[in-house]
């Protein structure tokens, strides 16, 4: 096994790692060969100097090589955020994923429990009755039958256990906050990816381009890792191998601007109840912002040509009950787990 010490020294001296060296470093971290001090020192040296595109590509390559894969259709999309925006909103990408599934576009959603908020995707889905601890075959069935499957990060990235304690002890953001959303176990090549800071918009679009993604929007909206209805959403879009940047406002989606307080959520149980209310017909700011994110996903996937058309398709999936049916089917199929599928 290669040595981590010279790579730590290199980063500590302000130098950047090439992709090969970054891959080597993260192979060492993920194999359990590094000490807690080495892990903490390396992660903080990267953080203080600033992670580069090549370093993230190398790290993601290491993550992907070790993940437990899931089979999904080629046109599947992932709607995911880095988390870490510290705002504590409702589970927007979760509801957007359910709506998107209701339109007939398959969603291979990757996520985790809350880290900095009260409710991550896993918390809300668990409260809705979705079983999380299921194997790849059953997740693939969920995607095929419900149009939506959830891949619980800790089930698919077991090598992360080697760095978990150090991350907790550091108590601050590291490169790993970026790696999860870039390491979808279903290999989804289409993504709506929300980031906690606008500085990561173009770099992460470049990372995903270099890793073979096809159609991606990396978004940041008014402090949130989502398309927002409270102000301007900044977008870096990967289309046909090229990256372009643009801004969106609520007007582009045909919705009224919202106040941030109208989007503040609670814990998993409270957020699950709010999500069910929208599926049952409640019209509020949570509905609007989730529709906007679903609409963005439809445009990314080529299921709609314009945001206006996409909003119509997404609204129909919600109002017709197709989105609610997708969730109900996800709950049913995920709970069919037996000892052979654990």
Swiss-Prot record:
Which leading EC class covers this enzyme?
transferase
Give the CC-aspect GO terms: cytosol
List its EC numbers: 2.4.2.18
Binding-site residues for anthranilate 1, renumbered to this chain: 81, 112
One GO MF annotation is: magnesium ion binding
Q: Which amino acids does the record list as binding Mg(2+) 2?
A: 225-226
Q: Which reaction does it catalyse?
A: N-(5-phospho-beta-D-ribosyl)anthranilate + diphosphate = 5-phospho-alpha-D-ribose 1-diphosphate + anthranilate
Protein name (Swiss-Prot/TrEMBL): Anthranilate phosphoribosyltransferase
Gene from which this protein is expressed: trpD
């Amino acid at each position: 096994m290669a040595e981590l010490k010279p790579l730590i020294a290199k980063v500590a001296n302000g130098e950047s790692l090439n992709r090969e060296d970054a891959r080597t470093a993260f192979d060492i971290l993920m194999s359990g060969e590094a000490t807690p001090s080495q892990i903490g020192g390396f992660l903080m040296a990267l953080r203080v100097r600033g992670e580069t595109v090549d370093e993230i590509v190398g790290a993601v390559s290491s993550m992907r090589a070790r993940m437990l894969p899931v089979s999904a259709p080629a046109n599947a999309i992932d709607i995911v955020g880095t988390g870490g925006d510290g705002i504590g909103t409702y589970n927007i990408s979760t509801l957007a994923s359910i709506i998107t599934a209701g339109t007939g576009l398959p969603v291979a959603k990757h996520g985790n429990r809350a880290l900095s908020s009260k409710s991550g995707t896993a918390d809300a889905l668990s409260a809705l009755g979705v079983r999380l601890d299921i194997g790849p075959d059953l997740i693939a069935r969920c995607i095929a039958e419900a149009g939506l499957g959830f891949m619980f990060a800790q089930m698919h990235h077991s090598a992360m256990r080697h760095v978990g304690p150090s991350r907790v002890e550091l108590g601050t953001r590291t490169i790993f906050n970026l790696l999860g959303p870039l390491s979808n176990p279903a290999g989804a090549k289409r993504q709506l990816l929300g980031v906690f800071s606008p500085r990561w918009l173009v770099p992460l679009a470049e990372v995903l381009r270099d890793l073979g993604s096809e159609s991606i929007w990396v978004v940041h909206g008014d402090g949130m890792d989502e398309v927002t209805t409270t102000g301007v959403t900044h977008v870096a879009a990967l289309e046909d191998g090229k990256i372009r940047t643009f801004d969106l406002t609520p007007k582009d989606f045909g919705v009224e601007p919202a106040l941030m307080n109208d989007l503040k959520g609670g814990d998993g149980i409270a957020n699950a109840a709010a999500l069910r209310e929208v599926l049952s017909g409640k019209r509020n700011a949570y509905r609007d912002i989730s529709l906007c994110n679903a609409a963005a996903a439809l445009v990314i996937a080529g299921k709609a040509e314009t945001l206006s058309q996409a909003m119509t398709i997404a609204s129909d999936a919600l109002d017709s009950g197709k989105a609610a049916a997708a969730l109900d089917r996800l709950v049913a199929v995920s709970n069919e787990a037996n000892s052979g599928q654990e």
